[in-house]
UniProtKB/Swiss-Prot annotation:
Protein name: 2-succinylbenzoate--CoA ligase
Keywords: ATP-binding, Ligase, Menaquinone biosynthesis, Nucleotide-binding
Organism: Bacillus pumilus (strain SAFR-032)
UniProt entry tagged with the keyword Magnesium: no
Listed GO MF terms: ATP binding; medium-chain fatty acid-CoA ligase activity; o-succinylbenzoate-CoA ligase activity
Matches recorded under InterPro entries: AMP-bd_C (IPR025110), AMP-bd_C_sf (IPR045851), AMP-binding_CS (IPR020845), AMP-dep_synth/lig_dom (IPR000873), ANL_N_sf (IPR042099), MenE (IPR010192)
PROSITE patterns in the record: AMP_BINDING
Amino acid sequence: MMKQPNWLLHRAYVTPERVALIYQDKKWTFRDLADEVNELSNRLAQTSLKKGEAVGLLMNNHPQMVMLVHACFSLGFKIVLLNNKLTKAERRFQLEDVKAAALFTEPVYASDHKGELPVYTMETLPEAGQENVKKIENDFDLNQTATIMYTSGTTGRPKGVEQTFGNHFHSAVSSALNMGLREDDRWLIALPLFHISGLSALFKSVIYGMTVVLHQKFDVDEVIGSIEQHRVTMISVVQTMLSRLLSRLEECPSSLRCLLLGGGPAPLAMLQESKEKGFPVFQSYGMTETCSQIVTLAPEFSVEKLGSAGKPLFGCELKIQDGTRICRPFEHGEIMVKGANVMKGYLYREESTAAAFDQGWLKTGDIGYVDEEGFLFVLDRRSDLIISGGENIYPAEIEAVLLTHSHVKEAGVTGIDDDRWGEVPAAFLVTDHKIPENELYALCESHLAKYKWPASFHFVDELPRNASNKLQRHRLKSKGFLDDSN
């Protein structure tokens, strides 16, 4: 059994006066944070909850959420991170599936699950006793499940991903070995803490001794102001956030040394603009099952390897496989990864867990290739692949071309049935101006082989996305969605 000292308690012992957290105008040192977490742990200890039980956490980004995470760890509870964008029914499924013993939430959500399980807010938690009635966990078992996050469920029911303390620790260490670590680093988080890209920064904070600058949500003006005021050095972003920063700034703020870009391959035009304006974008590839990034492209390769997700983090491995055969450079296949940051498995789903692994390698379900130097290029989801007349067509490739048009704001491509070819691509576009179809075909003609051209264009008000804001291409072909297009 491999153990480590409780991360927050050890960090508060080693560097007590370092700033741990900044939220709006308030700051907490690691000593302050540990003291407040100890008080909160005492309150949680007055409940009937037992070590090893799973508890739901449904909150917006806020210092209280940070403290609840650490307090739950201190009492040995497994935390189920709930997406506040989900419907009540979707959250209920996850709480029942994980066998949650209680839910910690905010007053705005408290009534949603009343009567289903014990529900606590900061206002309704018992007052602290004179002493803890439960033992504080001074050590973490690295093989123990720390957090459970449900996959987005782009196909079928979502599954609970079991992430261990060891997964989170090795993710943080691999990230530091890849991106470097400085004493003055400050990481801004405006992504939701219920997603791995947000939550992982909390663990990096206590493992590195680094300040987290927390925002409740992404507001471009507030984020820019915060970067300048607090001399932020690192920020986690997705495409939409990076796009807004680029639209507001002509050059990168001087303190920023890393914009960690996740959430899927970025359009080449966006990466090129980032380069021209001096934004140090680290394009990355990862998922809930890998506890955030597992492949990252360092900025020094961003020109010659534009569009690549990079190479595996230190201690991680990558291969491209087609069936049982390892693919050669530039040959397309399924992306498979391995490392100490890869999940324990899917909770209560032995068959799904077994199907997800092949001799210790995680089968990601994504299609990609590596070049002759081992740089990864992510093409698409295997489930979204279009096979037209025997040719493989990747929707993301077509979407990237369509997004280069100045009036196309969002693009989604899916395969629709065709008597002659089996399937043909159909494009769904959100635009800010009417675009003649001949313009779109001319754009495709200059960038794509003819068999990749969309057979039809559909103009819609919005694209279907799940709670994680991921495009749900399979919903594009539904009759209801086709009927709403024009």
